[in-house]
A protein has these predicted regions:
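Polar/charged alpha-helical tracts
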Residues: 4-8, 27-37, 41-42, 54-58, ...
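Hydrophobic membrane-insertion alpha-helices, especially the h-region
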Residues: 5-27
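N-terminal export/targeting and maturation segments
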Residues: 19-100
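Extracytoplasmic electrostatic interaction patches
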Residues: 69-169
């Protein structure tokens, strides 16, 4: 009888431990996704990479997407944020990112480094394309979405850094 009680106690303690572990794991996963833009803004990263813009698009289904006049979110297929006033589109498809503006498209790699530029008018570009200027424009256009991202109540910055540090360095 005593052995039976010990076995039941061990099973109960083990079961509670598993449930607590699973609960904490789900919470940590959800926290890292929902607050990913905030964490990415705080994370040290190599110059030229843009972790906050990457997280904005990669985790669009999990982050806070405020209702902002002139901004539309499209997660049908690849993720995209659309400035409907100016018809600018920032999108993510299969780990790469694009910024579309009029007859002009800029492609970025998985860390948001400039990959290619396409001009669909067939004309020669009137001036050289500067990566920093394009990124600054993207930040200005989509700043309302980035600025609206909340700060986490329980900060798991260390865990976010551990997961993404290598990608952005």
């Amino acid at each position: 009888k005593a052995l039976k009680g010990i076995i039941i106690g061990i099973i109960l303690v083990f079961s509670i431990g598993v449930v607590v572990f699973l609960g904490l794991s789900v919470y940590a996963y959800s926290n890292l996704k929902y607050y990913s833009v905030y964490y990415a803004q705080q994370m040290p990263h190599k110059e030229g990479t843009e972790p906050d813009l990457v997280m904005l698009l990669e985790n669009m289904g999990s982050i806070y997407t405020p209702k902002i006049e002139g901004i539309r979110y499209d997660d049908d297929g690849g993720n995209a944020i659309i400035d409907t006033k100016n018809n600018f589109v920032l999108s993510e498809t299969m780990g790469n990112f694009s910024y579309h503006k009029y007859h002009f498209s800029v492609g970025f790699d998985s860390t948001f480094r400039l990959h290619h530029v396409s001009d669909f008018t067939g004309e020669q570009p009137k001036r050289e394309i500067h990566e920093d200027e394009i990124k600054q424009e993207i930040r200005e256009v989509f700043a309302p979405v980035i600025d609206a991202q909340p700060k986490p109540r329980i900060n798991l910055q260390w865990l976010f850094n551990k997961k993404y540090q290598d990608r952005f360095n």
